[in-house]
Amino acid sequence: MTVGVEILETGVVGAVVDDSGRVTARAASDVGADLVAAVGAALERLSSASKGSSSLGIAASGMDPSAATRVIDSLTSRRSRALRKAVVGCGTAAALAESWIGAAAGVDSVVYFGVEPHAMAGVVRGGRPVIGAHGREPAVGWMALNPVEREDYRKSGCLDAEVAAAGIVRRLIWRIKAGDRSRVQDAVGGDLTAITYDLVVEAARAKDGVSISVMRDTAKYLGMAAANLVIMSDPAMLVLGGIMASAGDQLLEPIVWELGRRLPGPMMDALTIRSATLGPDAVVIGAARYAGFVNTTES
């Protein structure tokens, strides 16, 4: 068994994963002001279930690999000291998990692309994760898809500013302020600060025209980004996760259509596209899988 941990913006999620990829125990803790303490707390909660584990995989996105390494090197609990550790990006972890026991099980050339809450991507080739020269995964959130200068693009990247939950909400608010009428505005009693991504999706499903338009614009950005990932990697399968899986009824068809417009015909014909199947467990499962890869190589 191996322990996988995902570092989120506001919390830490950990899981014990057996040799078949099954999650046998879970734990979570709030980050607060001390990330190291939060990771340590999650590990302590898993301590009884993780007896016999020898490896710890920690997945973190938006964090420099060296910073993530310093976090795990700072873990002081007796349990964490006994584990061999490895750090991986969340997108790469999700790609590993989906290619192991998820939508791409048995496929040795996979690109994973997901958004929730931020854009992330990972590449598996020959059944192994593809990691950059400096330990980074594809920084898909920074993909430049709009040739304009905007402050939010400089802070979080063009793609992330457009397709992350906050970007989708912001575009709906812009439409409302421009004079378009949406049922979302009624749902929040006119308080635009109360609008959430979930409200936008629910309204789109209820045939709210403005919300449908915002989701279609989102799908266009997602399709362009997915096409660029495929063009660069030429995978056998593209796995779409996060909101592209959970809101697939609104996003999947226009994303596939956009892919068809932007990929060379033979490349599109050879590509298999699937929705991710592992949901929120994908990253912790993949982190555990990555730790197994690293420690097998080092042995």
Give residue ranges: language-model regions:
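Glycine-rich phosphate-binding loop of actin/hexokinase-like ATP-binding domains
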Residues: 105-166
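Short glycine-aspartate micro-motif
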Residues: 2-6, 53-59, 109-114, 120-122
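Short hydrophobic alpha-helical segments used for membrane anchoring or interfacial signaling
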Residues: 15-18, 88, 115, 124
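Short, glycine/charge-rich beta-strand/loop segments that flank catalytic centers
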Residues: 56-62, 90-94
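Conserved A3 ("GATE") glycine/threonine-rich loop of ANL adenylate-forming enzymes
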Residues: 10-11, 91-94, 116-120
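ATP-binding/phosphotransfer module of carbohydrate and carboxylate kinases, centering on a glycine-rich
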Residues: 1-55, 66-69, 73-81, 97-106, ...
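ATP-dependent carbohydrate kinase catalytic cores
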Residues: 83-99, 103-105, 111-113
